């Protein structure tokens, strides 16, 4: 039975080429599907003639945009995917929260990240946890980091005043 594999085009084409090579080596004639912005569709059609493409509006991937576009969301979820890949043009997956939110709503068996060096990591995506961490915890983490930075600066200024102004006058 042929595997249904979905790739979200979140990386440059050199990484996508690496990923496609990996998929073709490890799977026998897979059904490959892409989610791509409108601007990348022609390049995907040129490179991968067999791929089915879900066209996402131009701009960055955003959960709210997909959620509003019911036709696109429904057409993506008609199939249960055996594997979903989230490629990155970088080693780390910083700022991929929106993409993870999108992937967590798609019917799938397994989800993998694929970085620019070809390292594959299986992901466990739970929509509720991702949404809570991204939408609610991020502001608290941001405020906490600002608070800690402010305290460190304040302590450094107090230390400087005591060491170089108060103690210097006593000697």
For the regions a protein language model found, what residue spans apply to each?
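Active-site and donor-binding regions of nucleotide-sugar-utilizing enzymes
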Residues: 6-30, 35-131
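Residues that mark the start of a beta-strand
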Residues: 1-5
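A transmembrane-helix-recognition feature enriched in membrane-embedded lipid enzymes
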Residues: 127-171
């Amino acid at each position: 039975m042929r595997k249904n594999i979905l790739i979200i085009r979140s990386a440059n084409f050199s990484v996508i080429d690496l990923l496609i090579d990996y998929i073709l080596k490890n799977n026998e004639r897979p059904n490959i599907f892409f989610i791509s912005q409108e601007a990348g569709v022609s390049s995907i059609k040129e490179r991968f003639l067999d791929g089915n493409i879900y066209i996402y509006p131009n701009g960055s991937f955003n959960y709210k945009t997909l959620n509003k576009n019911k036709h696109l969301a429904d057409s993506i979820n008609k199939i249960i995917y055996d594997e979903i890949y989230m490629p990155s043009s970088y080693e780390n997956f910083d700022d991929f929260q929106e993409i993870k939110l999108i992937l967590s709503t798609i019917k799938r068996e397994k989800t993998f990240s694929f970085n620019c060096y070809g390292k594959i990591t299986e992901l466990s995506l739970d929509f509720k946890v991702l949404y809570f961490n991204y939408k609610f915890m991020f502001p608290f983490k941001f405020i906490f980091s600002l608070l800690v930075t402010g305290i460190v600066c304040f302590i450094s200024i107090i230390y400087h005043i005591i060491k170089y102004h108060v103690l210097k006058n006593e000697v």
